Amino acid sequence: DDDKLREECGIFGVSRAETASAIVALGLHALQHRGQEAAGITSWDGHEFHTHRAMGHVAGNFDRDYVIRGLPGGSACGHVRYSTTGETSLRNVQPLYAELNSGGFAVAHNGNISNAMKLRRELIRRGSIFQSTSDTEVIIHLVATSSYRTLLDKFIDALKQVEGAYSLIVMTPEGMIACRDPLGIRPLVMGTLGDATIFASETVALDVVGADYVRT
């Protein structure tokens, strides 16, 4: 029963919006039932990424104006955590951020990578240094070590190596990538809010921010 209660996280992303981080915070409120352990938001302002991650509920961390002001930009992604893998600590709170030669990116991930330990051992053998104990960082290292040139191709290559049930929102300077496992086990929906595109774990989050549902 405990495993069932702890199998869900919530992810939310928006691109091309004037107040992206405020929209994400509101969306995460609607997804709070999916994870009460921690919450985080990363934004992109056209020049650099900004991140705020904290233990506890969305309301306790993102209802303060100064926090949202510290997350400027037209794109943002967020995460509420209820861990299935990895210890309960700030280093495992998402979104996780990484910087490559091809640019930086932030990842918000829901799900479990069933072959994560096998991949982690192989990556460590090849020289990767892990900073967290979450499955998400395994994906980041697979992206970093991919021989493909573009970030999109690196992610495609990385996800071909993972097994399990997952949904991902990846924010890059060029745009936002959203994907699900091949069987679509973990939920992810797409919506629009004016000119903005939104991805979320559940349609209730689209409803709360006033977005129109587009597809699953």
Task: Walk through the language-model features, giving the residues of each.
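Conserved short alpha-helical segments that host acidic/polar catalytic motifs at enzyme active sites
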Residues: 1-216
